[in-house]
């Protein structure tokens, strides 16, 4: 059954019209418009070989400007507490994210929900740089229990249609990778180089 939902997400992110339209059938008009943005900026979505290999996630999502592994979870309850194998998967995603500078994601599908039934979460890592570092600020990380252990709460995730809007919009009103790079450059301290005349005057007065 889980492979069915993996395929559902894969069709949406890959910009496959037939599969995508079936998924968004019960979405609102606004949600459908955001979901369809991926048709113009689709991803190559590959099911990880031997899905479930430590740290690879279930899907590898690639495009010229971005790449991330996604672990797919499907439940009827809105919360999923990680333990045993699922906790091992999470720890492996953290390890590979730190080691490779990746931004691993969880995609959680809640059964029995109309509209956008997917929620996106980020696995917290400390090695993100550049555009991914800025993008990560927009995506909620997995919430934590009182003991500090990560878990999944569908209610606290980012709707898939909003995630697609962030990574697929092409104008400066949304942080696509090019726009994110511009923000990075803007946020960096600006160092003003003195003009030749200013430098000569400084040396003369010294």
Q: What name fits each language-model region?
A:
Residues 103-105, 109-173, 178-180, 187, ...:
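Domain-level recognition of nuclease-like catalytic cores that cleave nucleotide substrates
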Residues 1-50:
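Acidic-basic catalytic patches of nuclease active cores, encompassing PD-(D/E)XK
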Residues 75-114:
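Short, charged, amphipathic alpha-helix that recurs within catalytic cores of restriction-modification
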Residues 196-206:
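Long, low-complexity, intrinsically disordered segments
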Residues 18-22, 95-104, 128-130:
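Structural alpha-beta junctions
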Residues 44, 68-79:
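Short, basic, glycine/proline-bearing loop/turn elements
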Residues 57, 81, 116-120:
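A short acidic (Asp/Glu
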Residues 52-69:
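Active-site beta-strand-loop-beta-strand hairpin of nuclease catalytic cores
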């Amino acid at each position: 059954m889980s492979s069915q939902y993996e395929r559902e997400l894969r069709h949406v992110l890959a910009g496959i019209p037939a599969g995508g339209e079936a998924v968004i059938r019960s979405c609102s008009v606004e949600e459908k418009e955001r979901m369809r943005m991926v048709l113009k900026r689709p991803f190559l979505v590959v099911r990880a070989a031997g899905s479930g290999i430590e740290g690879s996630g279930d899907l590898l999502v690639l495009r010229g400007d971005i790449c991330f592994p996604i672990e797919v979870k499907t439940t009827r309850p809105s919360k999923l507490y990680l333990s045993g194998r699922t906790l091992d998967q999470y720890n492996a995603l953290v390890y590979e994210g730190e080691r490779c500078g990746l931004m691993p994601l969880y995609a959680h599908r809640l059964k029995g929900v109309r509209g956008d039934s997917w929620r996106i979460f980020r696995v917290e890592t400390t090695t993100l740089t550049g555009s991914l570092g800025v993008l990560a600020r927009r995506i909620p990380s997995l919430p934590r229990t009182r003991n500090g252990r990560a878990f999944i709460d569908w209610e606290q995730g980012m709707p898939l249609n909003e995630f697609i809007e962030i990574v697929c919009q092409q104008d400066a009103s949304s942080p696509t990778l090019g726009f994110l790079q511009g923000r990075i450059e803007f946020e960096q301290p600006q160092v003003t180089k003195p003009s030749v005349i200013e430098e000569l005057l400084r040396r003369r007065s010294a």
